[in-house]
Amino acid sequence: MPQRPEAARAGPVAGPDAASKPAPGPALTLRGAGRAYGPVRALRPLTLEIRRGERVALLGPSGAGKSTLLRLLDTSLAPSEGTVEVLGQPVADTDARRLRALRARIGTVHQQLLLVPQATAMQNVVAGRLGRTSLARTLAALVSRREAARVRAVLDEVGIGDKIFERVDRLSGGEQQRVAIARTLYQDPELILADEPLASVDPARAADIAALLARAFAGRTLVVSTHRIEPLLAHVDRVVALREGALAFDKPAAALTLRDLGELYEARRGAADPARAPAARPPSDPVVAPGGTLRIGASSTPGEHLLPSIVRAFARAYPGTRVSLSLSDSAAVTAAVRDGALDLGFVGARDDDPALAYEDVARDEIVLVAAPVLELPPEPITLEVAARLPRVDREPGSGTRAVVEQHLANMGAALDPAAVVLEAGALVALKAAVVSGMGVAFVSRRAVEDDLRGGHVRTVRVEGLSIPRHVFAVLRRSPVPSAAARAFLEVARAEVPP
């Protein structure tokens, strides 16, 4: 059971601020909209309407379908069935040009803030207006007085106007969150979608963020997904709850009771959902990991884009086996497997070490991507030009970086080290820098599939360049891998698309 609102008693709990007066007319309309990934239904057919100016909390435990629903609402994901209308436009009938214009009217606030750490608060805020400016332009100090005045105004509105010229990596976590909210506010959106902004923060900070969201986006349509309703209750008009991909309840915030929350979060009894059946059957003998825990390591691409679904499938198939998952670069993961600190690793590059065995798990390709706002030479560009473009790189131990450097060197077009404008220690930071227009980047296609579909980045065509990429499982040859490691690898093969 989650923590329950202290304000709640046996009857209804407190409602929204009196200042919130939703305007008539729908901002969002779903009619039987659902989403499936193969045989698994992430979101069952849902019919829902949210009025313009309404503030809605989207509640539910992890895996309930909240993020999938938000992706339908921000148009980055199409429904498998039913229809979605956003700000009066049927998404399925909207062409690419109008879809870009529609997305410009939608602001998002993420749990991962997607800020560029080496840039100032002002540069991050201005670069947030995707399709209208770029971080390269702001870094060149080409921000007009009018833009600078407006940035200061939105930073004042979130309480950090005095930090306008401070680098983001020198700000506190709370101040960075305010920069992210100011960036969205600067876009002047009609609809704001916030995905778990209260996750991983202490109760006092969660209350501050909830109040700030309500104040900063007053009068606009606001949808906030969360599994913690307490900080939001005083600031929303309505609570929509999901459980196992289906609507659990939809009611005014003032009518929410402790019983509602208890039923939402209590353990499900009865038959299992066939749509969420295990990927593999448990064997007749229990799978035991050495030391009681199966230690898995992964580099960014498999760790962030493949392993989450594999770990869930493994937990369903082998509920008695504990799994720990750690993320690092390919070199560090490989070294940890070699040293026995990990039982199994998932990496993007091989090491010529006879003590290690590699097995091909998934195929991918490395592509060159850029923000739509970044001006480049006419395409397709030559290898020599690609090697000299302003570039955002991963850290030296990255498997992607190693593969790209070796591939281009073999083609006689070694990457120019002087072209590196930022070395990002995490994939999320690299994508944020590219989206803001700082430079191009070589990335796994799997890692940017959502960004490509959403129009946040585009691929850059390069003459004669094709870089195949593999995701490998790495194990030690001796001692023989445990039954748990082998079972995990079997689940991975069944779960990961080719």
From Swiss-Prot:
GO terms for cellular component: plasma membrane. ATP binds at G60, P61, S62, G63, A64, G65, K66, S67. Part of the ABC transporter complex PhnCDE involved in phosphonates import. Responsible for energy coupling to the transport system. Its EC number is 7.3.2.2. This is Phosphonates import ATP-binding protein PhnC. It is an enzyme of class 7 (translocase). It is found in: Cell inner membrane. InterPro entries: AAA+_ATPase (IPR003593), ABC_transporter-like_ATP-bd (IPR003439), ABC_transporter-like_CS (IPR017871), ABC_transpr_LolD-like (IPR015854), LysR_subst-bd (IPR005119), P-loop_NTPase (IPR027417). Residues 270-498 are annotated as: LysR substrate binding domain. Belongs to the ABC transporter superfamily. Phosphonates importer (TC 3.A.1.9.1) family. It catalyses: phosphonate(out) + ATP + H2O = phosphonate(in) + ADP + phosphate + H(+). Residues 1-27 are annotated as: Disordered. The complex is composed of two ATP-binding proteins (PhnC), two transmembrane proteins (PhnE) and a solute-binding protein (PhnD). Residues 28-269 form the ABC transporter domain. It is a peripheral membrane protein. It comes from the Bacteria.
